[in-house]
């Protein structure tokens, strides 16, 4: 009973991952599009990490003190997420560079220094590298999408574009919801980890639970964002 809120938090997140995995798998079977397969793997591996915590709290009524089982699942999920971020964009976006992407390490490195004072160095390196890379690619994608939207708007005013002699910018705007969702996901991960360093409580006064509920929402939103990015 002491850990009831914690249990429901993890259970909700696991159910969200299970629903997302089922939905992504169904879309993959229907369309045979690779991003849906990667998304199903993302949901599945992240959900397995959460399931470990859920069962631990349910059966032993205590928060896990050994994180390796869950962290392996979460690190695997970051690999699938990064693979999606490398395969969904166009070749032009992959070549695009922006200095704003450096915001990701500027935020992640100080957080990493904080985390290693509380936890394992090796797994914190892997998890922070994964989330930092995801944030880097998302920021780049958002800047590229903004640039593409501006160029497309200018192109509509161009006579050559109107006559069809100039190529339209294409799909960058379609990836914007996906990049926003991934960026929200990584930001909430950092908020979650940071709150766990300073607050220890099993009540809703602990911001950890609110960040985790929002994280579950961002995980579910990943399915809708990916579907929009894929286009069908």
Protein language model features and the residues they cover:
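Hydrophobic alpha-helical transmembrane segments of multi-pass membrane proteins
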Residues: 12-23, 36-59, 70-80, 178-198, ...
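Internal transmembrane alpha-helix with an interfacial aromatic "cap," most often the third helix
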Residues: 20-31, 58-65, 70-104, 112, ...
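Cytoplasm-facing juxtamembrane segments at the starts of transmembrane helices
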Residues: 33, 37-41, 89-107, 126, ...
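Alpha-helical transmembrane segments of multi-pass integral membrane proteins
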Residues: 44-49, 74-86, 96-120, 127-137, ...
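Membrane-interface helix caps and helix-loop-helix hairpins in membrane proteins
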Residues: 59-65, 113-125, 199-203
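Hydrophobic core segments of alpha-helical transmembrane domains in multi-pass membrane proteins
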Residues: 71, 124-133, 208-213
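C-terminal transmembrane-bundle signature of multipass membrane proteins
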Residues: 136-232
């Amino acid at each position: 009973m002491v850990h009831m809120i914690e249990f429901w938090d993890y259970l909700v997140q696991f159910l969200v991952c299970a629903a997302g995995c089922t939905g992504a798998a169904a879309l993959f079977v229907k369309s045979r599009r690779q991003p849906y397969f990667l998304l199903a793997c993302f949901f599945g591996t992240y959900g397995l990490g959460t399931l470990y915590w859920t069962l631990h709290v349910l059966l032993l009524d205590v928060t896990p003190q050994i994180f390796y089982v869950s962290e392996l699942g979460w690190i695997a999920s970051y690999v699938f997420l990064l693979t999606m971020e490398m395969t969904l964009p166009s070749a032009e976006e992959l070549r695009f560079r922006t200095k704003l992407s450096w915001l990701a390490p500027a935020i992640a490195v100080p957080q990493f220094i904080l985390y290693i004072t509380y936890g394992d160095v090796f797994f914190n390196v892997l998890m922070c590298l994964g989330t930092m890379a995801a944030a880097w690619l998302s920021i780049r994608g958002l800047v590229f999408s903004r640039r593409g939207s501006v160029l497309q708007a200018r192109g509509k005013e161009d006579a050559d574009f109107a006559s069809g002699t100039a190529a339209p910018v294409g799909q960058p705007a379609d990836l914007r919801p996906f990049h926003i969702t991934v960026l929200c996901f990584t930001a909430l991960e950092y908020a979650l980890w940071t709150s766990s360093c300073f607050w220890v409580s099993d009540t809703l006064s602990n911001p950890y639970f609110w960040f985790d509920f929002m994280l579950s929402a961002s995980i579910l939103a990943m399915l809708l964002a990916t579907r929009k990015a894929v286009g069908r």
